[in-house]
Amino acid sequence: TASADQIQECFQIFDKDNDGKVSIEELGSALRSLGKNPTNAELNTIKGQLNAKEFDLATFKTVYRKPIKTPTEQSKEMLDAFRALDKEGNGTIQEAELRQLLLNLGDALTSSEVEELMKEVSVSGDGAINYESFVDMLVTGYPLASA
């Protein structure tokens, strides 16, 4: 996984005229230079979601951190992981536990990214989050680009 500095350096290399934007046609090359290997279908999906001729650094960071898999594959992997953590088998995870996972595992999020994400999450009175709804939100309903 590339560091924030490596992502920024990569973006600057592809930002040939130093205007803070990179052509959408360069997205695949930029991602590959950081070790991602998106298929053409995955790139077309991302380009369709972005719906723009160019992207900025914030959008590139978001795209880089997003898993490059189909929504069905993403959902299955995330649900399998949550089910493994769900000792009671009740389909929920505590808000505090989810925050810790997001801050510390895999491509960890920053505190501000976790706060933004948690604003979108429905939490029950006892602090529980239905992880199937959470996964569905991440895969289908959470904005790809922070505009």
From Swiss-Prot:
InterPro entries tied to this protein: CALM/Myosin/TropC-like, EF-hand-dom_pair, EF_Hand_1_Ca_BS, EF_hand_dom
Residues annotated for Ca(2+) 2 binding in this entry: 86, 90, 92, 97
Gene Ontology cellular-component terms listed: myosin II complex
Any Pfam family the entry gives: EF-hand_7
Residues engaged in binding Ca(2+) 1: 15, 17, 19, 21, 26
Domain of life assignment: Eukaryota
Entry keywords, A to Z: Acetylation, Calcium, Metal-binding, Motor protein, Myosin, Repeat
GO MF terms, alphabetically ordered: calcium ion binding
UniProt KW Acetylation keyword: yes
Residue ranges occupied by any EF-hand domain in the UniProt entry: 2-37, 73-108, 109-144
Keyword Transferase: no
N-acetylthreonine, modified sites: 1
Extra remark beyond the main annotation: This chain binds two moles of calcium.
Descriptive protein name: Myosin regulatory light chain
Originating organism: Physarum polycephalum
